Protein backbone atom coordinates (compact mmCIF):
# COMPACT_ATOMS: atom_id res chain seq x y z
CA UNK A 1 0.00 0.00 0.00
CA UNK A 2 2.80 2.33 0.92
CA UNK A 3 4.49 1.61 -2.42
CA UNK A 4 1.31 2.49 -4.31
CA UNK A 5 1.02 5.76 -2.38
CA UNK A 6 4.63 6.69 -3.16
CA UNK A 7 4.13 5.83 -6.83
CA UNK A 8 1.00 7.98 -7.00
CA UNK A 9 2.89 10.88 -5.44
CA UNK A 10 5.68 10.54 -7.98
CA UNK A 11 3.22 10.49 -10.90
CA UNK A 12 1.39 13.52 -9.50
CA UNK A 13 4.58 15.52 -9.09
CA UNK A 14 5.63 14.61 -12.62
CA UNK A 15 2.32 15.83 -14.05
CA UNK A 16 2.55 19.06 -12.02
CA UNK A 17 6.09 19.61 -13.28
CA UNK A 18 4.99 19.17 -16.89
CA UNK A 19 2.06 21.61 -16.50
CA UNK A 20 4.17 24.30 -14.82
CA UNK A 21 6.98 23.88 -17.33
CA UNK A 22 4.51 24.22 -20.23
CA UNK A 23 3.12 27.44 -18.82
CA UNK A 24 6.62 28.86 -18.38
CA UNK A 25 7.50 27.88 -21.94
CA UNK A 26 4.36 29.58 -23.21
CA UNK A 27 5.23 32.75 -21.30
CA UNK A 28 8.76 32.81 -22.67
CA UNK A 29 7.79 32.08 -26.29
CA UNK A 30 7.57 35.10 -28.64
CA UNK A 31 3.98 36.24 -29.24
CA UNK A 32 2.78 37.21 -32.71
CA UNK A 33 0.80 40.45 -32.59
CA UNK A 34 -2.74 40.37 -33.96
CA UNK A 35 -1.83 43.22 -36.34
CA UNK A 36 1.81 43.28 -37.51
CA UNK A 37 1.55 47.10 -37.90
CA UNK A 38 -0.06 47.62 -34.51
CA UNK A 39 3.08 48.96 -32.86
CA UNK A 40 3.81 51.32 -35.75
CA UNK A 41 0.26 52.65 -35.62
CA UNK A 42 0.56 53.21 -31.88
CA UNK A 43 3.77 55.16 -32.36
CA UNK A 44 2.25 57.26 -35.13
CA UNK A 45 -0.73 58.08 -32.94
CA UNK A 46 1.61 59.23 -30.21
CA UNK A 47 3.14 61.85 -32.48
CA UNK A 48 1.93 65.34 -31.74
CA UNK A 49 -0.36 66.87 -34.36
CA UNK A 50 1.01 69.93 -36.14
CA UNK A 51 -0.46 72.94 -34.34
CA UNK A 52 -2.95 74.97 -36.36
CA UNK A 53 -1.93 78.50 -37.24
CA UNK A 54 -3.93 81.48 -36.09
CA UNK A 55 -5.07 84.13 -38.57
CA UNK A 56 -2.47 86.51 -37.12
CA UNK A 57 0.28 83.96 -37.74
CA UNK A 58 -0.88 83.44 -41.32
CA UNK A 59 -1.00 87.20 -41.89
CA UNK A 60 2.59 87.49 -40.67
CA UNK A 61 3.70 85.21 -43.52
CA UNK A 62 2.84 88.02 -45.93
CA UNK A 63 5.94 90.21 -46.04
CA UNK A 64 7.34 93.02 -48.14
CA UNK A 65 10.54 91.12 -49.01
CA UNK A 66 8.72 88.35 -50.88
CA UNK A 67 6.34 90.86 -52.43
CA UNK A 68 9.27 92.92 -53.71
CA UNK A 69 11.05 89.88 -55.15
CA UNK A 70 7.93 88.80 -57.02
CA UNK A 71 7.14 92.28 -58.36
CA UNK A 72 10.72 92.77 -59.52
CA UNK A 73 10.69 89.52 -61.48
CA UNK A 74 7.22 89.91 -62.97
CA UNK A 75 8.01 93.50 -64.00
CA UNK A 76 11.48 92.71 -65.34
CA UNK A 77 12.50 93.31 -68.96
CA UNK A 78 12.83 89.55 -69.37
CA UNK A 79 9.04 89.23 -69.44
CA UNK A 80 8.66 92.07 -71.98
CA UNK A 81 5.49 93.47 -70.47
CA UNK A 82 3.64 90.12 -70.13
CA UNK A 83 1.47 90.67 -73.21
CA UNK A 84 -1.27 88.02 -73.51
CA UNK A 85 -0.37 85.41 -76.08
CA UNK A 86 3.31 86.31 -75.96
CA UNK A 87 6.24 84.44 -74.44
CA UNK A 88 6.59 86.78 -71.45
CA UNK A 89 2.99 86.16 -70.42
CA UNK A 90 3.53 82.40 -70.46
CA UNK A 91 6.73 82.80 -68.43
CA UNK A 92 4.72 84.77 -65.87
CA UNK A 93 2.10 82.01 -65.71
CA UNK A 94 4.78 79.36 -65.20
CA UNK A 95 6.38 81.49 -62.47
CA UNK A 96 3.05 81.75 -60.63
CA UNK A 97 2.52 78.00 -61.01
CA UNK A 98 5.87 77.26 -59.40
CA UNK A 99 5.06 79.59 -56.52
CA UNK A 100 1.72 77.89 -55.90
CA UNK A 101 3.33 74.46 -56.04
CA UNK A 102 5.98 75.60 -53.57
CA UNK A 103 3.14 75.86 -51.04
CA UNK A 104 1.99 72.31 -51.92
CA UNK A 105 -1.08 73.56 -53.78
CA UNK A 106 -2.60 71.88 -56.82
CA UNK A 107 -2.45 74.17 -59.86
CA UNK A 108 -4.20 74.18 -63.23
CA UNK A 109 -4.14 76.26 -66.42
CA UNK A 110 -7.35 77.34 -68.14
CA UNK A 111 -6.59 78.06 -71.79
CA UNK A 112 -8.81 80.27 -73.97
CA UNK A 113 -8.68 82.06 -77.30
CA UNK A 114 -7.93 85.75 -77.77
CA UNK A 115 -8.14 88.21 -80.62
CA UNK A 116 -5.77 91.10 -80.98
CA UNK A 117 -7.08 94.66 -81.16
CA UNK A 118 -5.00 97.17 -83.16
CA UNK A 119 -1.70 95.41 -82.47
CA UNK A 120 1.49 97.44 -82.65
CA UNK A 121 4.63 96.32 -84.48
CA UNK A 122 6.11 94.59 -81.42
CA UNK A 123 2.83 92.87 -80.49
CA UNK A 124 1.67 91.68 -83.89
CA UNK A 125 2.98 88.11 -83.59
CA UNK A 126 1.61 85.98 -80.79
CA UNK A 127 -0.43 82.92 -79.98
CA UNK A 128 -4.15 82.96 -80.55
CA UNK A 129 -4.49 81.60 -77.03
CA UNK A 130 -3.59 82.61 -73.52
CA UNK A 131 -4.36 81.15 -70.11
CA UNK A 132 -5.64 81.86 -66.64
CA UNK A 133 -3.84 79.97 -63.89
CA UNK A 134 -5.37 79.02 -60.58
CA UNK A 135 -5.08 77.00 -57.42
CA UNK A 136 -7.69 76.13 -54.82
CA UNK A 137 -8.11 74.99 -51.24
CA UNK A 138 -11.22 72.97 -50.55
CA UNK A 139 -13.42 74.01 -47.66
CA UNK A 140 -13.68 71.83 -44.57
CA UNK A 141 -17.44 72.19 -44.09
CA UNK A 142 -19.49 69.41 -45.67
CA UNK A 143 -22.12 71.89 -46.86
CA UNK A 144 -20.27 75.19 -47.24
CA UNK A 145 -17.35 73.71 -49.20
CA UNK A 146 -19.53 73.95 -52.33
CA UNK A 147 -19.67 77.74 -51.92
CA UNK A 148 -16.78 79.36 -53.78
CA UNK A 149 -14.74 82.43 -52.86
CA UNK A 150 -12.54 83.75 -55.68
CA UNK A 151 -9.46 85.89 -55.12
CA UNK A 152 -8.16 87.30 -58.37
CA UNK A 153 -5.60 89.58 -60.00
CA UNK A 154 -4.66 89.97 -63.64
CA UNK A 155 -1.11 88.99 -64.51
CA UNK A 156 -0.96 90.42 -68.05
CA UNK A 157 0.15 93.86 -69.16
CA UNK A 158 0.51 95.67 -72.50
CA UNK A 159 3.87 94.43 -73.77
CA UNK A 160 5.62 97.06 -75.89
CA UNK A 161 2.52 99.18 -76.41
CA UNK A 162 2.00 101.26 -78.44
CA UNK A 163 -1.76 100.98 -79.04
CA UNK A 164 -2.41 100.34 -75.34
CA UNK A 165 0.13 102.91 -74.18
CA UNK A 166 -0.99 106.33 -72.98
CA UNK A 167 1.72 108.01 -75.01
CA UNK A 168 2.04 105.55 -77.88
CA UNK A 169 5.45 104.46 -76.68
CA UNK A 170 7.00 101.55 -78.54
CA UNK A 171 9.06 100.33 -75.57
CA UNK A 172 8.67 97.66 -72.91
CA UNK A 173 5.88 98.56 -70.52
CA UNK A 174 6.90 96.69 -67.36
CA UNK A 175 3.57 97.00 -65.56
CA UNK A 176 4.90 96.92 -62.00
CA UNK A 177 1.81 98.47 -60.44
CA UNK A 178 -0.45 97.28 -63.28
CA UNK A 179 -0.55 94.54 -62.24
CA UNK A 180 2.59 92.85 -60.94
CA UNK A 181 1.57 94.38 -57.60
CA UNK A 182 -1.76 92.54 -57.48
CA UNK A 183 -0.19 89.34 -58.82
CA UNK A 184 2.52 89.40 -56.16
CA UNK A 185 -0.21 89.90 -53.55
CA UNK A 186 -2.08 86.92 -54.98
CA UNK A 187 0.98 84.70 -54.53
CA UNK A 188 1.43 85.81 -50.92
CA UNK A 189 -2.24 85.26 -50.14
CA UNK A 190 -1.94 81.74 -51.56
CA UNK A 191 0.87 81.10 -49.09
CA UNK A 192 -1.23 82.39 -46.19
CA UNK A 193 -4.22 80.24 -47.16
CA UNK A 194 -1.94 77.22 -47.61
CA UNK A 195 -0.66 77.75 -44.07
CA UNK A 196 -4.28 77.69 -42.84
CA UNK A 197 -5.22 74.67 -44.96
CA UNK A 198 -8.08 72.73 -43.44
CA UNK A 199 -9.47 75.70 -41.53
CA UNK A 200 -11.43 77.47 -44.28
CA UNK A 201 -15.11 76.50 -44.36
CA UNK A 202 -15.72 77.53 -47.96
CA UNK A 203 -13.57 76.62 -50.94
CA UNK A 204 -11.19 79.39 -51.97
CA UNK A 205 -10.01 79.73 -55.57
CA UNK A 206 -6.93 81.89 -56.16
CA UNK A 207 -6.71 82.90 -59.82
CA UNK A 208 -4.34 84.94 -61.96
CA UNK A 209 -6.30 86.18 -64.97
CA UNK A 210 -4.84 86.83 -68.39
CA UNK A 211 -6.06 89.20 -71.15
CA UNK A 212 -7.52 91.76 -68.74
CA UNK A 213 -5.90 94.49 -70.81
CA UNK A 214 -7.73 93.17 -73.90
CA UNK A 215 -11.13 93.70 -72.32
CA UNK A 216 -11.37 91.49 -69.23
CA UNK A 217 -11.24 88.39 -71.42
CA UNK A 218 -9.80 86.12 -68.71
CA UNK A 219 -12.46 86.86 -66.11
CA UNK A 220 -15.23 86.84 -68.73
CA UNK A 221 -14.02 83.42 -69.84
CA UNK A 222 -14.13 82.12 -66.28
CA UNK A 223 -17.63 83.32 -65.36
CA UNK A 224 -18.95 81.73 -68.54
CA UNK A 225 -16.89 78.55 -68.06
CA UNK A 226 -16.57 78.08 -64.28
CA UNK A 227 -14.38 75.33 -62.88
CA UNK A 228 -15.91 75.05 -59.41
CA UNK A 229 -17.33 73.35 -57.45
CA UNK A 230 -15.21 70.49 -58.78
CA UNK A 231 -17.33 67.88 -60.52
CA UNK A 232 -20.37 70.14 -60.74
CA UNK A 233 -19.22 73.64 -61.73
CA UNK A 234 -21.81 76.38 -61.28
CA UNK A 235 -21.23 80.14 -61.26
CA UNK A 236 -24.26 80.48 -58.96
CA UNK A 237 -22.25 78.68 -56.27
CA UNK A 238 -19.71 81.52 -56.27
CA UNK A 239 -20.41 83.73 -53.28
CA UNK A 240 -17.69 86.42 -53.42
CA UNK A 241 -14.93 87.77 -55.64
CA UNK A 242 -12.02 89.88 -54.39
CA UNK A 243 -10.10 91.67 -57.13
CA UNK A 244 -6.69 93.28 -56.62
CA UNK A 245 -5.56 95.57 -59.40
CA UNK A 246 -2.88 98.26 -59.04
CA UNK A 247 -2.35 98.17 -55.28
CA UNK A 248 1.26 99.35 -55.17
CA UNK A 249 0.82 103.09 -54.61
CA UNK A 250 -0.66 103.25 -51.13
CA UNK A 251 0.09 106.60 -49.52
CA UNK A 252 0.17 107.45 -45.84
CA UNK A 253 -3.18 106.60 -44.26
CA UNK A 254 -4.98 106.41 -47.56
CA UNK A 255 -6.43 103.77 -49.81
CA UNK A 256 -9.20 103.21 -52.27
CA UNK A 257 -11.55 100.29 -51.85
CA UNK A 258 -14.10 100.13 -54.63
CA UNK A 259 -17.52 98.56 -54.21
CA UNK A 260 -17.14 98.43 -50.45
CA UNK A 261 -20.67 97.36 -49.75
CA UNK A 262 -22.36 98.56 -52.93
CA UNK A 263 -22.67 94.92 -54.01
CA UNK A 264 -23.38 93.53 -50.54
CA UNK A 265 -24.09 95.11 -47.14
CA UNK A 266 -22.40 92.07 -45.56
CA UNK A 267 -19.16 92.83 -47.42
CA UNK A 268 -19.52 96.48 -46.47
CA UNK A 269 -19.64 95.54 -42.79
CA UNK A 270 -16.50 93.37 -43.02
CA UNK A 271 -14.64 96.08 -44.93
CA UNK A 272 -15.62 98.69 -42.35
CA UNK A 273 -14.23 96.55 -39.52
CA UNK A 274 -10.99 95.78 -41.35
CA UNK A 275 -10.52 99.36 -42.51
CA UNK A 276 -10.56 100.46 -38.89
CA UNK A 277 -8.07 97.74 -37.97
CA UNK A 278 -5.68 98.74 -40.77
CA UNK A 279 -6.22 102.49 -40.27
CA UNK A 280 -7.83 102.88 -43.66
CA UNK A 281 -9.99 105.67 -42.37
CA UNK A 282 -11.82 106.28 -45.59
CA UNK A 283 -12.81 104.24 -48.61
CA UNK A 284 -14.64 104.99 -51.81
CA UNK A 285 -17.78 103.37 -53.10
CA UNK A 286 -18.38 103.72 -56.82
CA UNK A 287 -21.55 101.89 -57.71
CA UNK A 288 -21.19 100.34 -61.13
CA UNK A 289 -17.43 100.91 -61.45
CA UNK A 290 -16.09 98.37 -63.92
CA UNK A 291 -12.88 98.27 -65.88
CA UNK A 292 -11.29 95.34 -64.06
CA UNK A 293 -11.83 91.65 -63.41
CA UNK A 294 -14.44 92.02 -60.67
CA UNK A 295 -16.97 93.40 -63.18
CA UNK A 296 -17.92 90.09 -64.88
CA UNK A 297 -18.55 88.56 -61.45
CA UNK A 298 -20.64 91.53 -60.34
CA UNK A 299 -22.72 91.28 -63.50
CA UNK A 300 -23.43 87.65 -62.54
CA UNK A 301 -24.80 89.09 -59.27
CA UNK A 302 -21.89 87.91 -57.15
CA UNK A 303 -20.74 90.22 -54.31
CA UNK A 304 -17.36 91.79 -55.06
CA UNK A 305 -14.69 94.00 -53.56
CA UNK A 306 -12.07 95.82 -55.60
CA UNK A 307 -8.78 96.83 -53.98
CA UNK A 308 -6.99 99.61 -55.84
CA UNK A 309 -4.73 102.48 -54.77
CA UNK A 310 -5.49 104.87 -57.61
CA UNK A 311 -4.21 105.95 -61.00
CA UNK A 312 -0.92 107.81 -61.37
CA UNK A 313 1.25 109.44 -64.01
CA UNK A 314 3.07 106.17 -64.77
CA UNK A 315 -0.07 104.19 -65.60
CA UNK A 316 0.32 102.46 -69.00
CA UNK A 317 3.71 104.01 -69.62
CA UNK A 318 7.22 102.51 -69.66
CA UNK A 319 7.81 104.26 -66.32
CA UNK A 320 5.57 101.88 -64.35
CA UNK A 321 8.60 100.10 -62.89
CA UNK A 322 9.31 98.06 -59.76
CA UNK A 323 11.45 100.76 -58.11
CA UNK A 324 8.41 103.05 -57.81
CA UNK A 325 6.27 100.64 -55.76
CA UNK A 326 5.54 101.37 -52.10
CA UNK A 327 6.33 97.93 -50.69
CA UNK A 328 5.30 98.70 -47.12
CA UNK A 329 1.95 99.81 -48.48
CA UNK A 330 1.73 96.75 -50.72
CA UNK A 331 2.31 94.52 -47.71
CA UNK A 332 -0.50 96.29 -45.88
CA UNK A 333 -2.92 96.00 -48.80
CA UNK A 334 -2.08 92.30 -49.23
CA UNK A 335 -2.67 91.52 -45.58
CA UNK A 336 -5.93 93.44 -45.74
CA UNK A 337 -7.00 91.43 -48.78
CA UNK A 338 -6.21 88.11 -47.10
CA UNK A 339 -8.21 88.97 -43.99
CA UNK A 340 -11.14 90.19 -46.07
CA UNK A 341 -11.26 86.93 -48.03
CA UNK A 342 -10.69 84.84 -44.90
CA UNK A 343 -13.64 86.47 -43.14
CA UNK A 344 -15.94 85.76 -46.07
CA UNK A 345 -14.67 82.16 -46.32
CA UNK A 346 -15.59 81.52 -42.71
CA UNK A 347 -18.74 83.59 -42.28
CA UNK A 348 -21.62 81.67 -40.74
CA UNK A 349 -24.01 82.81 -43.45
CA UNK A 350 -23.42 83.36 -47.15
CA UNK A 351 -22.86 87.05 -47.94
CA UNK A 352 -25.90 88.42 -49.73
CA UNK A 353 -25.94 90.35 -53.00
CA UNK A 354 -27.72 93.71 -53.00
CA UNK A 355 -30.18 93.18 -55.84
CA UNK A 356 -31.98 96.44 -55.06
CA UNK A 357 -29.02 98.58 -56.12
CA UNK A 358 -27.87 96.45 -59.07
CA UNK A 359 -26.70 98.37 -62.13
CA UNK A 360 -24.75 96.39 -64.69
CA UNK A 361 -21.10 97.38 -64.93
CA UNK A 362 -19.54 98.21 -68.26
CA UNK A 363 -16.17 96.76 -69.19
CA UNK A 364 -14.47 100.00 -70.23
CA UNK A 365 -10.86 100.06 -69.14
CA UNK A 366 -10.83 103.18 -66.96
CA UNK A 367 -11.07 101.48 -63.54
CA UNK A 368 -14.13 103.63 -62.85
CA UNK A 369 -11.90 106.56 -61.96
CA UNK A 370 -13.59 109.37 -63.85
CA UNK A 371 -15.47 110.42 -60.71
CA UNK A 372 -12.83 109.46 -58.16
CA UNK A 373 -10.09 111.58 -56.57
CA UNK A 374 -6.68 109.99 -57.00
CA UNK A 375 -5.88 110.42 -53.32
CA UNK A 376 -8.20 109.25 -50.59
CA UNK A 377 -7.29 110.71 -47.24
CA UNK A 378 -8.78 110.55 -43.75
Residue ranges, per PLM feature:
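Positively charged n-region of N-terminal signal peptides that target proteins for export
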Residues: 1-4
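N-terminal hydrophobic or amphipathic helices/low-complexity stretches enriched
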Residues: 25-98, 102-107, 378
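Second-shell loop/turn segments in exported
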Residues: 53-61, 77-87, 119-124, 168-179, ...
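Catalytic-core environment of secreted peptidases
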Residues: 61-79, 97-107, 131-207, 227
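Solvent-exposed loop/turn segments at secondary-structure junctions
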Residues: 78-81, 100, 106-107, 119, ...
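A non-catalytic alpha/beta surface segment that caps or lines the substrate-entry region
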Residues: 82-138
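Acidic/histidine-rich catalytic neighborhood of metal-dependent amide-processing enzymes
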Residues: 126-131, 159, 170-266
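Active-site-adjacent substrate-binding region
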Residues: 249-377
Amino acid sequence: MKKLYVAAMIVGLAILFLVVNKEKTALLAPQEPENPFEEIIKQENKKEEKPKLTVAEAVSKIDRISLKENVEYLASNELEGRMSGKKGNKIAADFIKKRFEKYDLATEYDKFSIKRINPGPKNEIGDDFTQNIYTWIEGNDLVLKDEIVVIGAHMDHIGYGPSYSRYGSNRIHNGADDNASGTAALIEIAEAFAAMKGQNKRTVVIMAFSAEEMGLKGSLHYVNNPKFPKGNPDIKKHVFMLNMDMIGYLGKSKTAVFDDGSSSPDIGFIIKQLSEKYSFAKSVTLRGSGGSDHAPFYNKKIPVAFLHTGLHDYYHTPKDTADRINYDGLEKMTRYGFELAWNVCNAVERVEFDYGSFTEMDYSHDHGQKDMPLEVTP
